[in-house]
């Protein structure tokens, strides 16, 4: 072999200390070892250098380690790939075939090398093998990996000669690069220096021809897991980069970076020194300037490592070529780098390495650091030198980074965007659209710093390009799906209007653009729009608002916005404007009116507040569940980390005002204006002064941004805690309505109060009287009127109600909370929420009132009732006589803290909303402020003196002045009956839509569109009417209580030091007598009932924490009489229709009501003080009795362990030792409560493998595991499965003793309908296979069958775990048993996914086995495997066929394979299988077909389970160590161009456009889809099912323009997508042909015809066969003719490929046509003449089938055969 050029290996430069150490390690080398090679000079040079190349033999073992993970092609891959391509040789060239066979299989391939070497001169220095060159290169690569020293030498010599013969011109062949470059780099670590030298020489030649490929391979060597290879590659790199002229054309950026990465590795100091030595030598060869440019491009961290190494190595004596600042590089180095090599800059702005770190999804710290570096980089950015396209790309990068899940990345990206806007200056107008689009992505974020950043961006944009241009683009997002984005858009408009002069805006256009927000479905957006219109009107000036009202008129007429004009006029009448805060946020002038504030007297109630409070445009209160960052603050921009997502409803004023609002003694206020219009469809409830309303403004002096809600974690942790530790300071603070202050002022923190998501997590109004104030048991009185209105709203007391509690001696701090309805959000479901409990407040006076939404007689107060109580429509006065409520809660400039309104109520649009009344004082006066100050100064002793006295004196619930009460009741009822609302209600009748102003609205149950009931309570279970504790579902429907009757049962939580462990009763048990209406949900009840009142005269027997309040009815005969009882205990069903009050069971105290018929006796039956019986409806009683019976049976079935783990028992121990057996739940409580609370206290999950631990007593654990698996409770099943996994991992010997019983139990759970249990069982089986290995052989049949059947599940995580379990089975059990169980379990299954999974894992078994063993004639194996492989190879699924062919491919290397095929494969399948084997020999196996887009796209659709192999990457089900054992090899597939977040965002955008209401938007969406298909096909293909699910509707759009554009677009997309359309072909064809082929529009018909033709031309006709047959059979008219003719065309093309399928499907259509066609050629009912098309189809079939067609027609009815013969040409028949 000729000597290499002498310059390849120059003499070493004066070695540095580091390099001397490196070279000295490998001095022991015998120069004579290369004597057999030519080139003595090179030997000498080689001997010197390769001593260094060899490395330290002491540190590098002589025996080569396996190369499985070193470079691109592992040895296994090389060796196992030879059975394929080798067999692809044709028989034409026997010599080449023989040589390849020698290279593959011969133990000594030297003969082949000599033959190839000898043939080189004849072939001009070329190898030959024109068709098998790739196979030859791979064979040579195999020799380099597995051959001996001599074989490797011959191979390297041959490669060297071949490369020299080819010359130095041209690129390397791709086959050579893929097969040999990795193995050549691996050869650099050879112990033999001669081999290293030869490999280095070849790489040098390759480097001149294809530098990029060689450098990439070298970098892989530098980063290989093999330490010897890394060291050898780093040491030989400088030698490879000689001479210097070679370096001029190389880009060594990545090489320098790879070497620099090793400098900071302290653990491998030797590698670090080697890398530094290589950098030194490369720097000497490159020269100072170029080396500086490379080093300065390093990331700052790597530069620091290099500098430190430089300092430690040389100190101040740095060589000239390495002269750099020892402390770091100068900052001026970076700009010159950009000039030197801009190719290293992404978007010509940021380095490639920084770009890669920005997109690193593995390490968030890497991304955050990269964003910080990007900010620094952008500080020096000069936009004038950057092209427009690069800046757009950079903004696109920032757009994508704003989707990051890490807050710091998003925040930093916004700062970068702001810096970019600043740098661009006036040039930003060219990029205005992309910048705004990026900024809009974060508008939904409620974090304060995020708001500040994007406000800076928008204000800077407005400054540079003007506000109107910015708003024009921004307002395009006013239809955004996220309500917060819509609101923020309006708020930014308000901010700009308040910042810039009106001349800078197009105010009329702005008015029309903002007008749709007035009728938005979300209350907060409507409020923002009202505020914006107030600013617009101010900007326009007086007399110029006609345009404004015209815009409102347009919306009112077009968008069903009845009442919006009145709302705008009312808002303008307030003469107040929003303002900007110091932070630049908008502060509304008008508070968001909660139902509490909207009815209180501090804010004038008008049409604008009514408009905000009402709403018929949202689905329900539950619609906010997914948007619970929405309504956090009234102040736009305030930050709230925990958002309550429940709408609350509190007591208001007007007709529905609470009793204490007008029964307080003293002087009544002067401004008691009557306003009967104030009543809407809101129910009024009382409030507890300890719990702040979620919609109340903060108290005086409290910051507006304080948070009102506790986090969910805290609420879960403090579910049932209660506290009495209130002092005089904390109580008023809580009463002021600011929970943030309550959090800081309460001793022991608010978490001890059990305030779980304050204001957000309570139950139904009529049944949940949760918070009860208590007072002196002997002197103070507690009055309550139960609200029997609709249980649709939840409330906490308004601020006015609470502040009145401390105003003086007559204050009533004992106000209650009457929660109303549940939230259907999963976050607030029973798994996450808890009932509220709070300790009572003490005062001299406790007036505890529960208001009725119907105007009713107020109970008597502490002193003589005021005559003003009779005025039912008057506003209430404050307890001090100074109109306290109205004034202290007047409009403040400080914004209110608002907590999630839910569904808007009303907005029926049936009548105009009255404008705001004039003449109402909106601001507080000095008297109010002084009153509030007095209230805050109450002495502590008032509260402390009552601290331990929690009993409530109910003895005076019997009212003294019955005449006055009755008179007031009659007055109220008369007032209501005479009202206009009552008249309208009568006119509408019982079937009319609910009238929000009618008095009956208080009794209506308001239902939403998507919820069967809003009266159920998700976070509370109930004692039902019978007293039986029962669980209520989140979406439970209303009880079918007989009309005219109503049952009510309300439970109080316990108070005092004992923890409250109660769930409050659900409103399901408090159902209304109502009739369902399609339009209104429920109409008013026609037969109202009367609720009698109880008067408890004795309180001596009341327990310390028990309160019973019984409601007083208001309908029917007002002559109610009191009745007494002394035991405040729960009642339960005992017999007949009565409720005996039983003292033995003492659940949490509550309110117990009863249903009384309209004409029932007014006085309940009283037997004695301890036994009060209340009548109920018999039907209800029967239900309750049955339920109680079932619950008791369930309880009896539970063992003692259940009681020990009972949440009630745990609560008992957590609370206080004072809990006695009397407080234990009744028999009906435990099972339901356990079910409701199990997810709160403990949610069983699948344990990670790393969490498995051994048992101290495994035998007991095994018995317990079997018992748990047999339990009916799914949670216990999960626990049992985890037990089994632990036993398998650590006690396998013990488990083997009961393996059959255990496996049987686990297999049964695999079939469990609960997906969590099923998945856990699948994981458990995988562990059993992994740890027990061949011990599982006897259990394989049942286990594998169950697993295979689960492979057809739609849940991706189930399929993933099944894949893992089966892979574990394949790897660990006996292969023969695995084959048998797989074939038995899934070969003949009907589900396509089961068969695919079976074939996949069967192929894995075959791959693991020796083909010789399979094909050796062993009957058990060959007899089962070959027929199975043949069947799978003919399956309908492409993937299944692939695995079938793979099994054949793996077995066909046996010389007797053909005989085995003939022996074991049925004769009918044999020709097809032989053809398949022949193709495999010629073409190889190929890759697995992916005909259904990317794997990601398929996995996202459960329906595609039959067409895809599920990903084998489990979600934390297995540890990383186990994945090495159980992971299924990934199917090769194209990488998705975008991440999942981008893909999801794209789908939302494109489907939103395609489904838009405006036809122009739909057309734009269609055009956008075409553009994306042309420019970004991978994205479309990856989500093709979701996209075309929206697009298919456009193919038959009602708008002909859209229809035509869609068809024309489809015609253009078909050639682009081709077979990628296969997943959607069945839904696409009906959309194309059903209406369009019968269209009278010639354009649409022609377009549809073109689409069908394009489908036939570009899509596999086999996919079209069945849909075309269906349409030809069932369509009518012209469409039937066209589809029949098109079917004939398909037959001509397809029959040769798929004769059987074509006959099977097409003949059915032909017999249908012939059998129904009349003599005239038409079909009955089909229209049109079908004879021509039928004749064409018949001739096409006859051409392909010949006489066989007539033979098959003979089996049909005679007229069909006759018709067929008539249609066929006579000349054709005569030829037969």
From Swiss-Prot:
Q: Which ranges are annotated Polar residues under compositional bias?
A: 826-836, 845-855, 871-892
- State where the protein is found: Cell projection, Cilium; Cytoplasm, Cytoskeleton; Cytoplasm, Cytoskeleton, Cilium axoneme
Identify the stretches annotated as HEAT repeats.
175-212, 214-246, 250-288, 344-383, 389-426, 430-465, 466-503, 505-542, 1297-1334, 1338-1375, 1541-1578, 1582-1619, 1623-1661
Instruction: Output compositional bias ranges, type Low complexity.
Output: 988-1000, 1509-1520
**Which portions of the sequence form the region TOG 4?**
1540-1776
- Region (Disordered): which ranges? 655-676, 817-921, 970-1000, 1062-1084, 1493-1536
Annotated segments matching region TOG 3: 1259-1481
Q: Which domain of life is it from?
A: Eukaryota
Gene Ontology BP terms: axoneme assembly; non-motile cilium assembly; positive regulation of microtubule polymerization
Compositional bias per record (Basic and acidic residues), positions renumbered to this chain? 1521-1533
Q: Where is this region: TOG 2?
A: 351-595
Stretches the record annotates as TOG 1: 94-311
Query: Which key words are in the record?
Result: Cell projection, Cilium biogenesis/degradation, Cytoplasm, Cytoskeleton, Repeat
GO cellular component terms, A-Z: ciliary basal body; cilium; cytoplasm
What effect on the protein does mutating residue 364 to E have, as reported in its record? Expected to disrupt microtubule binding. Abolishes the ability to promote microtubule polymerization
Annotated domain remarks:
The TOG regions are composed of HEAT-type repeats that assemble into a solenoid structure. They mediate interaction with microtubules.
Q: Say which family it is in.
A: Belongs to the Crescerin family.
Q: What does this protein do?
A: Involved in ciliogenesis. It is required for appropriate acetylation and polyglutamylation of ciliary microtubules, and regulation of cilium length. Interacts with microtubules and promotes microtubule polymerization via its HEAT repeat domains, especially those in TOG region 2 and 4.
Q: How does it assemble?
A: Interacts with ARMC9. Interacts with CCDC66, CEP104 and CSPP1.
Please state what the protein is called: TOG array regulator of axonemal microtubules protein 1
Species of origin = Mus musculus
Q: What is the lineage of its organism?
A: Eukaryota, Metazoa, Chordata, Craniata, Vertebrata
